[in-house]
Amino acid sequence: PPVRREPISLDRFILLKGIPAGISLLLLSIPYGMTTNYVAMYAKQIGINATTGFFFTFMAIGMAISRIFSGKIVDRGKITQVISAGLYLVVFSFFLLSACVYLISWNNMVCTIVFFSVALLLGVGFGIMFPAYNTLFVNLAPNSQRGTATSTYLTSWDVGIGIGMLTGGYIAEVIITPQ
């Protein structure tokens, strides 16, 4: 007798209850994709003379610091508060990063300090947000769909980063440096 297989359905690949959170995560990972790929170009364009590779070092330090305390807060059931705090910190950091274009003409050293401080703050912000999102997705799913929940989380993350890289490349090529 033929083997009976369940029909393929969307809910085997994407956690339907997690779509709103997935859209939110996708939108948050767009600036992450832009920043991690084009921040060195931005620094060079505005005139920051420091080694921009340290930006990623400070970002990694911020992520490491965030892991010390954010997991404990999430374990106490404050997932949305952790995500909100990370979001506010990231938005504030991006405003500071955009201010560097004006700070550089005032004081190069202050601008460089702000630039690397932004990296630290972005690391903390993203470092507390993204693991909290993973917990959120897993908590939304029944035990039988935890793999689907993780798939939805990672798909949202990857698509957002991809859109961020494409958009950042377009901005860098067409808008910032027109021929």
Task: Go through each PLM region and give its residues.
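Intracellular juxtamembrane helix-capping segments at the cytosolic ends
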Residues: 39, 128-141
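Cytoplasmic membrane-interface "Motif A"-like loop-to-helix N-cap segments
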Residues: 76-88
